[in-house]
Regions:
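N-terminal signal peptide
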Residues: 10-21
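Mature catalytic domains of secreted/periplasmic carbohydrate-active enzymes
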Residues: 19-444, 452-468, 473-476
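Extracellular/luminal ectodomains of metazoan preproproteins built from arrays
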Residues: 479-480
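Classical eukaryotic N-terminal signal peptides for Sec-dependent ER targeting/secretion
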Residues: 1-7
């Protein structure tokens, strides 16, 4: 049972003279409804599956692997979706077309697709979307416009216009019309600076064609999120560790328009949520390979990475690759199910929670006190700012726990900058969409928690922190 929370909110005295002398603050950029929903849900399951799966080690197909190599014998996209639900994800993101250009749907724009494979009547994208709808998951496609290795192997080498036009046609097939319905998100890898990198494209084609492709996607599917593009951008690593502190405000990159970020700060003019990807496989491989060596992280390790990504305000893509038969290995499913059950038990049954509260920031600022209703061995706190309505404000904060025997005791900032699995402490800086703090339960438990904003960012209303929620939890043993 959730204890009824007693909430005490204190504000510092106003300082009218000091305030009058300060320059007018900037208005806080706010997320779109799609960005808010994307961040509030926390994480997605990434599914790397394609021609690379049918090799022993190829992670980056240059387009030379024969289409006939694609030959799944037990494809089960329902199993993928059931696994995503079991781990607690709200969406699945599927490699509809990876770097080599092989399309997992029968594209009329290309001669390098499932139509030329060993299973020419199989539309994997179609099966994937149907499974997403069946299990209540949002569908997402990995389909980067700079990645089409097979096309670049053709003679004569395609022009920029031919290259870009094929991509636009593929987006029409995936996002336009009614064939697959609304797609929540597309994911652009290495974009827009990958030309000449993992997959070549015509000289000078990118980032020059970036705006054209953005505008085309906006036209055919206006509410589809473009991730690692104008709606969400990468934190800069694939280690399963989000940036911290993390501000979701940025300034434009001078080389690329359409809201591609160049620098991040608490007072940037554009709101841009962040995302990070990581693979479940200990090898670090994104695709499953028939080496006999692929092993999954265990549930506790998955939690450690969740804590360092979702728990620090970053959207997390956890990659769970099917094997060459077309199913996710049972050993992977087992660990994800254990993790998902433990996460749900922890998050969905808070000891106490309060919504929509505010407190002033700064030295001598206000505080929010949360009563637990009893003495409880709380060892986790989740904080969320009301980013959708008031933007991101908090730059620094403190947490204290009240012991009936010892009074108020500070919960210390983490000594581990990554808040690693097994580590503990209060993050203590930014909050944004979410921050999760874990710490050893006080000996004898506590009956109250107190939160205080000690510094704010530089947006309008930055002197007041608005929390969408403040909750106390006892972690499931798997997460300790």
């Amino acid at each position: 049972m959730i204890a009824r929370a007693l909430l005490l909110v204190a504000f510092a005295p106003s300082r009218a003279a000091a305030t009058a002398a300060m320059p007018a603050p900037l208005p806080a950029p706010l997320p779109t409804p799609q960005q808010s929903a994307y961040m509030d849900t926390g994480f997605s399951m990434f599914v790397h599956f394609g021609l690379n799966t049918f090799t022993t080690s190829t992670e980056h197909n240059d387009g030379s692997i024969p289409a006939k190599a694609f030959a799944p014998t037990r494809l089960d996209t329902d199993q993928w979706a059931a696994t995503a639900k079991a781990m607690g994800a709200y969406a699945m993101c599927f490699t509809a077309k990876h770097e080599g250009g092989f399309a997992l749907w029968p594209s009329k724009a290309s001669n390098y697709s499932v139509a030329q494979s060993s299973v020419p009547t199989l539309d994997v994208v179609g099966e994937f979307v149907k499974s997403c709808r069946k299990f209540g998951l949002q569908p997402c496609f990995y389909e980067s416009p700079v990645e089409n290795g097979h096309l670049m192997l053709q003679k004569p080498t395609p022009t920029t216009e031919q290259f870009v036009q094929q991509e636009l046609t593929m987006y029409d097939e995936l996002l336009g019309g009614s064939q697959y319905g609304h797609i929540e998100r597309i994911w652009w890898d290495h974009y827009p600076y990958a030309c000449g990198g993992l997959s070549s494209c015509p000289s000078g084609s990118f980032p020059a064609s970036y705006n054209r492709i953005v505008e085309h996607v906006r036209k055919i599917s206006p509410t589809t999120i473009i991730s690692n593009g104008p709606d969400s951008q990468w934190v800069g690593n694939t280690r399963g560790v989000g940036a911290y502190p993390i501000w979701n405000y940025c300034s434009l990159d001078t080389e690329v328009s359409s809201k591609f970020c160049g620098a991040w700060s608490p007072h940037g003019p554009i709101y841009m949520p962040r995302m990070e990807g990581y693979s479940l496989q200990r090898s670090g491989h994104w695709f499953w390979h028939d080496t006999g060596l692929e092993q999954a992280l265990n549930a506790s390790e998955i939690w450690g990475h969740w804590l360092r990504t979702v728990g620090r305000g970053t959207h997390w893509l956890l990659n769970v690759p099917p094997n060459s038969t077309g199913v996710i290995p049972e050993a992977y499913v087992k660990q994800l199910t254990i993790f998902g059950s433990a996460l749900a038990a922890t998050l969905e049954r808070p000891v106490a929670i309060v919504h929509n509260v505010s407190a002033s920031c700064g030295p001598g600022g206000g505080s929010i006190t949360l009563s637990l209703g009893a003495v409880v061995a709380v060892d986790m706190v989740q904080l969320r700012e009301d980013v959708a309505n008031t933007g991101q404000t908090v730059a620094n904060y403190t947490l204290e726990a009240h012991s009936p025997a010892k009074g108020w005791l500070p919960l210390s900032p983490s000594s581990d900058p990554e808040v690693a699995a097994g580590g503990s402490g209060v993050n203590g800086q930014t909050i944004g969409h979410r921050v999760v703090d874990v710490f050893p339960a006080l000996e004898g438990g506590c009956d109250k928690l107190r939160w205080r904003c000690t510094a704010a960012g530089q947006q309008e209303g930055g002197g007041v922190a608005h929390l969408a929620s403040f909750s106390a939890h006892v972690r499931h043993p798997v997460l300790q």
